[in-house]
Amino acid sequence: MAKNKFNTSWLHDHINDPYVKMAQREGYRARAAYKLKEIDEQDKLIRPGQVIVDLGAAPGSWSQYVRNKLSQGKHRDAQREGGIDGTIIALDLLPMEPIADVHFIQGDFREDNVLAQLEEVVGDRDVDLVISDMAPNLSGVAVADAARIEHVCDLALEFAQNHLKPDGALLVKCFHGSGYSQIVEKFKHQFKTVAARKPKASRDKSSETFILGRHLKRPR
């Protein structure tokens, strides 16, 4: 009974969520697009001509937002071609419906064959921005969940260290709780500037927080 009551309450909140309604109206696949939008508007992360990698991209709302942003500021040549001014690579273990102008690679970004596909798209350019909305499956056991969250953040940090340009940026989702301070310290070890962001589009009951790191301390 309690579970059914919880599900009914969540469904009611979801249906009446203004960001859900806005996403449906504006064609985004998930309300998460507005979290990235708010952070981008505050921190000016996305600019024309950039190479941007979206980790854990499915269902694709973050890539949709980036695509829309890069199409607004595109050069005249890109406009004639109907494309975007920049490069977007989305990666996920799960399948994702195609998005115009977004290169999607399905697979584990730690594996050589996936990295080879990424490098084929990127060429000899370094990545300007890595964004990650990845989240592990949580068990409700605090210690276990903290380890899983930290592991996902570690994967994004390692990817950023290997692929970002020196003045690049990494934005990842994490959760307040056990292990949060350790994740922040890892960001501070790797980046010159670190900030936490809690966009209004994050649900009030959610402990999710986004950590932004800029300018690598030890670029490869």
UniProtKB/Swiss-Prot annotation:
<keyword id="KW-0949">S-adenosyl-L-methionine</keyword>
<dbReference type="InterPro" id="IPR050082">
    <property type="entry name" value="RNA_methyltr_RlmE"/>
</dbReference>
<keyword id="KW-0808">Transferase</keyword>
<dbReference type="GO" id="GO:0005737">
    <property type="term" value="C:cytoplasm"/>
</dbReference>
<comment type="function">
    <text>Specifically methylates the uridine in position 2552 of 23S rRNA at the 2'-O position of the ribose in the fully assembled 50S ribosomal subunit.</text>
</comment>
<keyword id="KW-0698">rRNA processing</keyword>
<protein>
    <recommendedName>
        <fullName>Ribosomal RNA large subunit methyltransferase E</fullName>
        <ecNumber>2.1.1.166</ecNumber>
    </recommendedName>
</protein>
<dbReference type="InterPro" id="IPR029063">
    <property type="entry name" value="SAM-dependent_MTases_sf"/>
</dbReference>
<keyword id="KW-0963">Cytoplasm</keyword>
<feature type="binding site">
    <location>
        <position position="92"/>
    </location>
    <ligand>
        <name>S-adenosyl-L-methionine</name>
    </ligand>
</feature>
<feature type="binding site">
    <location>
        <position position="60"/>
    </location>
    <ligand>
        <name>S-adenosyl-L-methionine</name>
    </ligand>
</feature>
<comment type="similarity">
    <text>Belongs to the class I-like SAM-binding methyltransferase superfamily. RNA methyltransferase RlmE family.</text>
</comment>
<dbReference type="Pfam" id="PF01728">
    <property type="entry name" value="FtsJ"/>
</dbReference>
<feature type="binding site">
    <location>
        <position position="108"/>
    </location>
    <ligand>
        <name>S-adenosyl-L-methionine</name>
    </ligand>
</feature>
<feature type="active site" description="Proton acceptor">
    <location>
        <position position="173"/>
    </location>
</feature>
<feature type="binding site">
    <location>
        <position position="62"/>
    </location>
    <ligand>
        <name>S-adenosyl-L-methionine</name>
    </ligand>
</feature>
<dbReference type="GO" id="GO:0008650">
    <property type="term" value="F:rRNA (uridine-2'-O-)-methyltransferase activity"/>
</dbReference>
<dbReference type="InterPro" id="IPR002877">
    <property type="entry name" value="RNA_MeTrfase_FtsJ_dom"/>
</dbReference>
<keyword id="KW-0489">Methyltransferase</keyword>
<feature type="binding site">
    <location>
        <position position="133"/>
    </location>
    <ligand>
        <name>S-adenosyl-L-methionine</name>
    </ligand>
</feature>
<dbReference type="InterPro" id="IPR015507">
    <property type="entry name" value="rRNA-MeTfrase_E"/>
</dbReference>
